[in-house]
Amino acid sequence: MPRRRLRVTGRPPASSRIPRGVRTVPWPDYGEIMSITSRRGWRLLGPAFVAAIAYVDPGNVAANLTAGAQFGYLLVWVLVLANLMAVLVQHLSARLGVVTGASLTELLGRRLRPVPRRLFWAQAELIAAATDLAEVIGGAIALHLLFGLPLIWGGLIVGVASTLLLGIQSLRGQRPFQHVVMGLLLIITIGFTAGLFAAPPDWSATAEGLIPRFEGADSVLLGASMLGATVMPHAIYLHSRLSVDHAGADAGASEPTPGESAARRRALLRASRWDVVFALVIAGSVNIAMLLLAAGNLQGVPGTDSIEGAHAAVAAALGPGIGVVFAVGLLVSGLASTAVGCFAGADIMAGLLHLRIPLLARRVITLVPALAILAAGWDPTRALVLSQVALSLGIPFALIPLVRCTADRTLMGEHVNPRWMTILAWAATTAIIALNAALVWLTAVGLA
């Protein structure tokens, strides 16, 4: 049976599946969308900021603090490279959603045969579960640091709070949800950069850290973990869906003329580029700040191989106020990222299995594995780092279809990737797969 080809139209198809409980925004007014470079253009920003929450989740905290505490400034280059890759990847994801009017998972659901489609869904759901695990555990650790709550109770509170956050998306629509998430991203940024301003890093050592190199198997493992925490599979799936919703996928929007449709699409693509750059520059800066904070203040300090130990060391070195701000940043990171991850999981199921479960019901279901880990007494920081390794292994399954779809002229029309962009995307995908292969080999032979 030949693969189905999708024709590009001026309006997202009416069949575009949106997870139940998700409200879309109206198709933007023509005058508004053409004013992206004016004062009103900021209103078109937002989807990338929601996706960027995935880049500053508790898994990043565990991976980046561990890397800085163990290897100092050695792996700065990994974060810089990973964030450059993230800008390219999220741009492609947004581009796909704007041009086709469908998310990546929906396109794969149409193109894949039943068995490959179910297998793809299974691995995507496992990756989403690993993501949720990291986010709930991170929030629980933050509540323990702030109030001394047992981890299991902290996990329950994070689950309830993230459910309320999802309620904003379900009841008020995407734009209010985006505004809330952008505010949370600001709090996260303050929480994880305050310590850096209090104790600036060694900038000459930071510059040396930009030279690509590893030192032993453990640094490769951490490099893969940092890459998995930075280039997030569920963020790739989610951003294409958010772009569809933001462009106005609801059936009640007015039908544009062909000329307006082309102009709107070009303006939306221009807006999405700025959206991605702004959001990921912020997220990337936060990631690098985490590593520099650990490299400058935690290297060689006993007990910093856990988030709790790192927090104690930061508070001891920079004062209890910085410690509280750090813990608040971690808590908000967990709350925001678990809600965003649940939304991404709903799109995965809707696009690949054509099943739609209410977001609130899905939140309850996905909370169970994280609570089980907390109740079992496993080392939470180790669970966070391993979850990021799992995310790294899932990246190729999201990247390869994304690059293939955005390089398909039949699907993308005049907005197909330029040749240089496709080459860069394939180079990034190849590098990630090679690093993953090294990680699997090191784990198999017991070196990692």
Summary of predicted features, one role per range:
Residues 121-125, 146-168, 187-191, 356-372, ...:
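Transmembrane alpha-helical segments of multi-pass small-molecule transport proteins
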Residues 39, 66-91, 105, 109, ...:
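Extracellular loop-to-transmembrane helix junctions
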Residues 157-158, 169-196, 214, 390-391, ...:
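Membrane-interface loop-to-helix entry segments
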Residues 86-99, 243-247, 251-261, 281-309:
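Extracellular/periplasmic helix-exit of transmembrane alpha-helices
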Residues 115-117, 152-155, 278, 321-323, ...:
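Loop-to-transmembrane helix boundary motifs in multi-pass membrane proteins
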Residues 185-211, 220-241, 402-410, 435-447:
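Hydrophobic alpha-helical segments and their helix-loop junctions in multi-pass secondary transporters
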Residues 51, 78-111, 120-126, 165:
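Juxtamembrane transmembrane-helix boundary signature
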Residues 63-68, 91-116, 168, 172-173, ...:
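Flexible loop linkers connecting adjacent transmembrane helices
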